[in-house]
Amino acid sequence: MSEITIDSFSQEAFEDPLLLLEELKRMGQLADSSREAKSVEQQTEEDIVSTNSEEQYKQFIDEVSDMKKSFSYKPILIKAMMEYADVNGRASMSDIIDYYLNYFQTRADQGKVVEKAESTFVQHFGDRKAARRTILIYPYKRFEMKGMMKFDKASDQIEIVPPIWDNISNKIRRVVASYCDAQLLRYYEKLETT
């Protein structure tokens, strides 16, 4: 079986976030099947670490592609992380809060629906303290419970855990951000018609 890498994806995959996420999932499935071909005795500690890393990455991609959302918060957090995370997958809360506030301010400036009326970002528009509390309670907590993100109080940063972040190339960052854009577009279309 020939190895599939992100460089072997079709150009169409890079133009269609849904298609690219399917390709990424297929990559994960191929890695799973090649690993299963090894007997338990043949698996090394490196294989086991790799399995855990690949499995966490696959779960992250699955979560991104099938994000359940009551509000727009999760895709915005992922977009902020894709934009501001450093080489270690960490982004400051200040940058993340700025991203949220700028996102909602831009929607307001364009005369678009900002969020549901009960949203913190509507009720406390522009309030950094309320934004911080909401980000840490809702979208972040969901990813933390799944072992995908951590929050470091000392540095005031959210981190995408290394087993996931180490598998995210710049191309994948762009694809994930594009996919979040598509999810936000669908979310707001639905919100504006209800």
Regions inferred by a protein language model and the residue ranges of each:
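Intrinsically disordered, charged low-complexity linkers and terminal tails
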Residues: 1-194
